[in-house]
């Protein structure tokens, strides 16, 4: 069988696999096609006590066979199997007698190799769906005939390859294929993520029943491994750790304190001006109780006026650079993160200089986690993962330090929930370990900065589609080309539910002239927000359903919000000019304080994984005839429930969080001067990321 997409590319693949330095008898190899969830697959397999190793997709089949791997899992990825830049792979991986599970892109690869076809269809699936499964298939043994799974793809299997049968469907889309005699299985959905309710059962079926894994692999003590790495890397040098006061940097500092002598650790907390209310003071007090001496630096002025160097343009491939605007005049989320990251490093260098330390003898320690590196496409985590957003602690400058071996990141293979467990093992107090994550750039990335509205040529058509969806029961009586498009993107069951919802409730759905970051089909999306308002009391289950449905039909929408208050008669088509000024930050800081204070008092803080509060440049309720300028802003409450921060769902009022708690937040935030409306984010991840920027 010929090698796919370029034989020469495989001649040098395999590396350590070919020279015999490693042996993986009984282990599972995960071939990385560039999925955002590649490391999650690895983690789920290891949770089932099976050793797993991640290697490039182009690893040759003979190398996999020689090293004794028992089975192969192929991850998802952002490419199309027919794209010119589709990653190279060896099709012999399917014919060496090893059980194979192809996930998402991996399933499409498998189907294509055996003569099936894959097409880009009008329906894009991004979110949680009910699928029907054949539970007589070995992969789905023990499951119900209908299962809840995460789907995130644009391409779909069209013609199923000879020898394979369809074992799962999402409406009329193929969601699973199998060739039981050859032990080849494909899942269009993601069994590795928490949003797939019985994903662990599916992986267990593959590992134990199909591949015959023994389940004898236990991961060595994470704490001891981290301490060993710190000691080996640092030796007698000093380590500078930048403390945000969050779980990650605190656990990182506690590990450094345990691994090294106290005088080797320089703990610095930089108040960047984007902290929450009274945050810096509480950070210093909490860490002093742990015996960690912290140097607090007020650097708000340096951050507000910080700049960085950027490419001349996104299209310019030359090494030419330009100086960015100052941070307090920057609207681009990516530029904001880069400026903040580089300013952090500059201040760290200043601290080293003030303490008369030699830079070449000092390491920079960070509490960077695996999801951070995956989302910013760092080569440490994945050679292929598509960029979703730039993390403030994974900028070009820090990558350079990492290349020089001067950055130490002992938590780089941990996910958030694992860090909490490690923190408890280290003896950290529960109030620190269980606190909600807070991004390093702080409130700076929770302000949607804008000078102009985001309105592209697709705005009118998308707005019309949303009108049809919101009034579907009436729209079906008036034939329209866009109505046919809505029907083509939905199942009969979806249309039935949409009829029911729009018959019972008076809804209004429209685009908001702002954009937020999301993740769709393993790629970054930078798309519109859909707003929904109603004269009725919100039916939250129906709203959540609409939030799942709308991004499937409108691929240029990655987030859906409910707008509290009376129906929005005239959606805003302009924005309030918004930058990172002290007044804007003070408004958001107070809104964040009110919301989190109410959540803590309710006793539900532990049930919500994270709750970003976002300030948007939107001013509602203006009479267009009076030409009143946009001068107010609106707040978004983004509740988020997750086990790994790679995927997650919003807390549904009335289920995961009491309705009265949410309404109390709305009431208190509305009292803040300059606030127009309060919105509630209904979006799961994907298609929306945890943060809005």
Curated annotation (Swiss-Prot):
InterPro entries: Class_I_gatase-like, GATASE, GMP_synth_C, GMP_synth_GATase, GMPS_ATP_PPase_dom, NAD/GMP_synthase, Rossmann-like_a/b/a_fold. The modification N6-acetyllysine is found at residue 9. It comes from the Eukaryota. Residues 217-435 form the GMPS ATP-PPase domain. ATP binds at residues 244-250. The active site is at 104 (for gatase activity), 190 (for gatase activity), 192 (for gatase activity). The modification Phosphoserine is found at residues 8, 332. XMP binds at residues 337, 522, 610, 685, 691. The gene is GMPS. Transmembrane segments: none annotated. The lineage of its organism: Eukaryota, Metazoa, Chordata, Craniata, Vertebrata. It is an enzyme of class 6 (ligase). Gene3D superfamilies: 3.30.300.10, 3.40.50.880, HUPs (3.40.50.620). It catalyses: XMP + L-glutamine + ATP + H2O = GMP + L-glutamate + AMP + diphosphate + 2 H(+). This is GMP synthase [glutamine-hydrolyzing]. The modification N-acetylalanine is found at residue 2. Pfam families: GATase (PF00117), GMP_synt_C (PF00958), NAD_synthase (PF02540). Catalyzes the conversion of xanthine monophosphate (XMP) to GMP in the presence of glutamine and ATP through an adenyl-XMP intermediate. Homodimer. It comes from Pongo abelii. The keyword Cell division does not apply. The modification Phosphothreonine is found at residue 318. Its cofactor is Mg(2+). Keywords: Acetylation, ATP-binding, Cytoplasm, Glutamine amidotransferase, GMP biosynthesis, Ligase, Nucleotide-binding, Phosphoprotein, Purine biosynthesis. It is found in: Cytoplasm, Cytosol. Residues 27-216 form the Glutamine amidotransferase type-1 domain. One of its GO terms (molecular function) is GMP synthase activity.
């Amino acid at each position: 069988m010929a090698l796919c997409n370029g034989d020469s590319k495989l001649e040098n693949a395999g590396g350590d696999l070919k020279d015999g330095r490693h042996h993986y008898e009984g282990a599972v190899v995960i071939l990385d096609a560039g999925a955002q969830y590649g490391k999650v697959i690895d983690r789920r397999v290891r949770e089932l006590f099976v050793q797993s190793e991640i290697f490039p997709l182009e690893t040759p089949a003979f190398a996999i066979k020689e090293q004794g791997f028992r089975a192969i899992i192929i991850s998802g990825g952002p490419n199309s199997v027919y794209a010119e830049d589709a990653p190279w792979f060896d099709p012999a991986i399917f014919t060496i007698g090893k059980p194979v599970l192809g996930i998402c892109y991996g399933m499409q690869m498998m189907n294509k190799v055996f003569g099936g076809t894959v097409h880009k269809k009008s329906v894009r699936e991004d979110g949680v769906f009910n699928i029907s499964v054949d539970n007589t298939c070995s992969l789905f043994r023990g499951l119900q005939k209908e299962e809840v799974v995460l789907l995130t793809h644009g391409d779909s299997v069209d013609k199923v390859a000879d020898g394979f049968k369809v074992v799962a469907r999402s409406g009329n889309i193929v969601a699973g294929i199998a060739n039981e005699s050859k032990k080849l299985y494909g899942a269009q959905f993601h069994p590795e993520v928490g949003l797939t309710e019985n994903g662990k059962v599916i992986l267990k079926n593959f590992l134990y029943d199909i591949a015959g894994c023994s389940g004898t692999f236990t991961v060595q003590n994470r704490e001891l491994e981290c301490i060993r790495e710190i000691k080996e890397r640092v030796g007698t040098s000093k380590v500078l750790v930048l403390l945000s006061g969050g779980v990650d940097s605190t656990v990182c500092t506690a590990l450094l304190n345990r691994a090294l002598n106290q005088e080797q650790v320089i703990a610095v907390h930089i108040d960047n001006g984007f902290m929450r209310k009274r945050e810096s003071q509480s950070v210093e007090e909490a860490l002093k109780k742990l015996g960690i001496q912290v140097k607090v630096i007020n650097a708000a002025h340096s951050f507000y006026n910080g700049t960085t160097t950027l490419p001349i343009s996104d299209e310019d491939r030359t090494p030419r650079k330009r100086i960015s605007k100052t941070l307090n005049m920057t609207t681009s989320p990516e530029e904001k993160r880069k400026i903040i990251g580089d300013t952090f490093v500059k201040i760290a260098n200043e601290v080293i200089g003030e303490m008369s330390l030699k830079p070449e003898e000092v390491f920079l320690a960070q509490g960077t986690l695996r999801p951070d590196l995956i989302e910013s496409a760092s080569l440490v985590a994945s050679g292929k993962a598509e960029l979703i957003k730039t993390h403030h602690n994974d900028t070009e400058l820090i990558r350079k330090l990492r290349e020089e071996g001067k950055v130490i990141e002992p938590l780089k293979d941990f996910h958030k929930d694992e860090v909490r467990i490690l923190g408890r093992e280290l003896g950290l107090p529960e109030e620190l370990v269980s606190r909600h994550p807070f991004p390093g750039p702080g409130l700076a990335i929770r302000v949607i900065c804008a000078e102009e509205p985001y309105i592209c040529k697709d705005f009118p058509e998308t707005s019309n589609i949303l009108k049809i969806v919101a009034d579907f029961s009436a729209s079906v009586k008036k034939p329209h080309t866009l109505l046919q498009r809505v029907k083509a993107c939905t199942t009969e069951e979806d249309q039935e539910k949409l009829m029911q919802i729009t018959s019972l409730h008076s809804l209004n759905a429209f685009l908001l002239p702002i954009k937020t970051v999301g993740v769709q089909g393993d790629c970054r999306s930078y798309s519109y927000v859909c707003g929904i308002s109603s004269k009725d009391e919100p039916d939250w289950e129906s709203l959540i359903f609409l939030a799942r449905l709308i991004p499937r039909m409108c691929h240029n929408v990655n987030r859906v919000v409910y707008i509290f208050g009376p129906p929005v008669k005239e959606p805003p088509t302009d924005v309030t000019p918004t930058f990172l000024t002290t007044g804007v930050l003070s408004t958001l800081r107070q809104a964040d304080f009110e919301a989190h204070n109410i959540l803590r008092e309710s006793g539900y803080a532990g049930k919500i994984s994270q709750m970003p509060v976002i300030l948007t440049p939107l001013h509602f309720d203006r009479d267009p005839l009076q030409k009143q300028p946009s001068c107010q802003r609106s707040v978004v409450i983004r509740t988020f429930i997750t086990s790994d921060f790679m995927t997650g769902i919003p807390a549904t009022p009335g289920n995961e969080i009491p309705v009265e708690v949410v309404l109390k937040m709305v009431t208190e935030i509305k009292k803040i001067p300059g606030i127009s409306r309060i919105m509630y984010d209904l979006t799961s991840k994907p298609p929306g990321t945890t943060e809005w920027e």
